[in-house]
Amino acid sequence: MSIPKDLRYSGEHEWVKVEGEKARIGITHFAQSELGDIVFVELPEVGAEIKADEPFGSVESVKTVSELYAPINGTVVEVNEDLDDSPEFVNESPYEKAWMIVVEPSDASEIEKLMTAEQYEEMTQED
């Protein structure tokens, strides 16, 4: 399992990619593999406020429904609408096609508090 080095990670298996003043968020390869085949993704509306460690959406797989937890505080500025018609992107391409939301962070320094790729890899090996 390849863990991209340029991202930050939460304990709930979300990734964050800094893009200028914004942050792109999705779920990790580890998370999608644990969930199995994704059949539906529910995401917030543009303009919604998300709060760190609180649910901002959910993914439904053939096995279960799992909540998505915000890794940082911020305002949703973009939602990946491709996931409405193609939720399988989460399984096929969790770091590219299956990003979930783009957020304008309330405090960009929160991102630095998330795990590095190395720390995330250690955590997933313990699970």
Swiss-Prot record:
Quaternary structure note: The glycine cleavage system is composed of four proteins: P, T, L and H.
Effect of inactivating the gene: Strains are lipoate auxotrophs. The requirement for lipoic acid can be bypassed by addition of both acetate and branched-chain fatty acid (BCFA) precursors.
Organism of provenance: Bacillus subtilis (strain 168)
Free-text cofactor note: Binds 1 lipoyl cofactor covalently.
Record-stated family: Belongs to the GcvH family.
Protein name, UniProt field: Glycine cleavage system H protein
N6-lipoyllysine found at: 63
Keyword presence, Protein biosynthesis: no
Alphabetical UniProt keywords: Lipoyl
Pfam family, one: GCV_H
Domain of life: Bacteria
Source taxonomy: Bacteria, Bacillati, Bacillota, Bacilli, Bacillales
Boundaries of every Lipoyl-binding domain copy: 22-104
